[in-house]
From Swiss-Prot:
Note on domains (UniProt): Aquaporins contain two tandem repeats each containing three membrane-spanning domains and a pore-forming loop with the signature motif Asn-Pro-Ala (NPA).
Gene (name only): Aqp5
Keyword Transmembrane among record annotations: yes
Upper lineage: Eukaryota, Metazoa, Chordata, Craniata, Vertebrata
Protein name, entry field: Aquaporin-5
Motif (NPA 2) on chain: 185-187
GO BP term, example: odontogenesis
Membrane topology: Multi-pass membrane protein
Chief site of localization: membrane
Cellular component annotations (GO), alphabetically ordered: apical plasma membrane; basal plasma membrane; cytoplasmic vesicle membrane; endoplasmic reticulum; microvillus; plasma membrane
Residue numbers on the Cytoplasmic membrane side: 1-12, 61-65, 75-87, 148-158, 225-265
Compartment list: Apical cell membrane; Cell membrane; Cytoplasmic vesicle membrane
NCBIfam families hit by this protein: MIP
Intramembrane stretches listed in the entry: 66-74, 181-191
Source species: Mus musculus (Mouse)
Length: 265
């Protein structure tokens, strides 16, 4: 775990999650600003969120994995894909990035267009219980899309993961906006709520629904549909951040050999 944290690549990845979430929140919320001359449409907002996540997944995905979502990060932790420490740093970076993105938009947008900065809220007589189910389903399909389209074990052509993920986010918004404003991402809900200081009694919905949905998708995908062949020892090593793939072990064999020889002398 110490080795992982001390690497430059680790902190590049954490910064990439911060930057990606900042940009995602800025563009997503920006598409929902209520300009007096032209109110946003459901289609406009849905496409904007989808384009934003697709663009960022393509641009910064190679650096950090392009989670940009605490629910996805926690699901990948449960799915034994990342270490506990990486998950903690990623979630912290995502939340700070969301606050920064919402804050920048608040500062730039005029008061007559700002509105409530697209803070998520229940609408159309949606109860908290129903809202949780809606967010669970929306995030479940998003998480499955992410896991499947980015699975390195797949040998068949998968197309563009960034495009698939962007379309999945767009799909979720086309349905979810009518119920909850569509979150699918606790950071997206948390950022504007902090900036506007508007935490409704139902704010928990935008944490519980997405996290449960993503975790259920991870359990289904990584343990039932496409289980990993890693041993229990290797699974523990992944969570601790000490797991080294066989390819890396071969690459570093000579380095280890020299170290052993020096120690022997």
């Amino acid at each position: 775990m110490k080795k992982e944290v001390c690497s430059v690549a680790f902190f590049k990845a954490v910064f990439a999650e911060f930057l990606a979430t900042l940009i995602f929140v800025f563009f997503g919320l920006g598409s929902a600003l209520k300009w007096p001359s032209a109110l946003p449409t459901i289609l406009q907002i849905s496409i904007a969120f989808g384009l934003a996540i697709g663009t960022l997944a393509q641009a910064l995905g190679p650096v950090s994995g392009g989670h940009i979502n605490p629910a996805i990060t926690l699901a990948l932790l449960i799915g034994n894909q990342i270490s506990l420490l990486r998950a903690i740093f990623y979630v912290a970076a995502q939340l700070v990035g969301a606050i920064a993105g919402a804050g920048i938009l608040y500062w730039l947008a005029p008061g007559n267009a700002r509105g409530n900065l697209a803070v998520n809220a229940l609408s159309n007589n949606t109860t908290p219980g129903k809202a949780v189910v809606v967010e669970l389903i929306l995030t479940f399909q998003l998480a499955l899309c992410i896991f499947s389209s980015t699975d390195s074990r797949r040998t068949s052509p998968v197309g563009s993961p960034a495009l698939s993920i962007g379309l999945s986010v767009t799909l979720g918004h086309l349905v979810g906006i009518y119920f909850t404003g569509c979150s699918m991402n606790p950071a997206r809900s948390f950022g504007p709520a902090v900036v506007m200081n508007r935490f409704s009694p139902s704010h928990w919905v935008f944490w519980v629904g997405p996290i449960v949905g993503a975790v259920l998708a991870a359990i289904l995908y990584f343990y039932l549909l496409f289980p990993s062949s890693l041993s229990l020892h290797d699974r523990v090593a992944v969570v601790k951040g000490t797991y080294e793939p066989e390819e890396d072990w071969e690459d570093h064999r000579e380095e280890r050999k020299k170290t052993i020889e020096l120690t022997a002398h």
